[in-house]
């Protein structure tokens, strides 16, 4: 099949959305006779980690911030309107994949009129994500258009793919009361087949590692709340425990708050693996946002037991109760912490389970199975 793939994410760097989108692009490229990729670029930074078989068409959007805000108010929520029409008319595509509902907005009906099948990948229940991450003046117009484009995508796609079961249920409840939409869970996976995990010795000391984008509200605010409510419990249960938090672009106020409580902050590390190898346990306290918290994969990939807020455990159900322990209250945190410290674990076993679930090959197999049982069956 010939596939046109349109993504909302800049395909360079190490963000969670970037990681997931690379995997989807490469998996669809693997399963397609030919894949054309429309992707955003800025500052002429080329996409990274994309299958060489993909035909890449980069699209820039160099406008001042005030003009972008006017575009948002008018409902111009992506950059692909003109170029998409040209590419769609240039050849016959069997399948068009929209990577987020945003890039499908006002394009999906054009695709359907051409007789192409449509897949939309939902990285989050987008309305919930907007509520948790954006403030005035962007929040309200973005939320308004998000509701419209998310509904349009769910109701007009031949197949909707989500990263978690929770998001599948949220989308169905919000936009599919009639039960007509096809919504399946694909999860996430590595974007290349040589991304095998490496076994390194973990710290023998009780060192807890937290990673994430420290410029995002859904990372910073829950962590500050965790420091206030849960850090005293951690230090009570594990005297001498050390907490290290690493991520890009932390605010100075965040760094000061951490240092006051004796938490080490590693700013914008160039090698996250070296930070992870300093720890023994992985901690994910994020309690906001939808989608899947890809940073939990950092811990599992390195063979570390994970302690996560139940919101952060979405998408990791096969690991819950074993490699991943969950909490949502101080009492459940204390219980999960004690279990994690007393139950023996094997680094190689955790890594093997990670590979079985999140390897590139596992992702391709999941995608192929979903396509064959849905749109390719038609």
Language model regions located:
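Donor nucleotide-sugar binding/catalytic pocket of nucleotide-sugar-dependent glycosyltransferases
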Residues: 57, 151, 155-195
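Membrane-proximal helix-turn-helix segments that form the acceptor-binding/catalytic region
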Residues: 85, 126, 140-160
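N-terminal subdomain of nucleotide-sugar transferases
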Residues: 1-49, 91, 236
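Short hydrophobic beta-strand element within catalytic cores of glycosyltransferases
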Residues: 295-298, 305-309
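Active-site proximal beta-strand in glycosyltransferases
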Residues: 3, 95, 111-131
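Conserved catalytic-core segment of nucleotide-activated headgroup transferases in glycan assembly
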Residues: 26, 185-257, 261, 265-273, ...
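Acidic donor-binding loop of glycosyltransferase active sites
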Residues: 158, 277-291, 302-304
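A charged, aromatic-enriched C-terminal amphipathic alpha-helix characteristic of glycosyltransferases
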Residues: 342-375
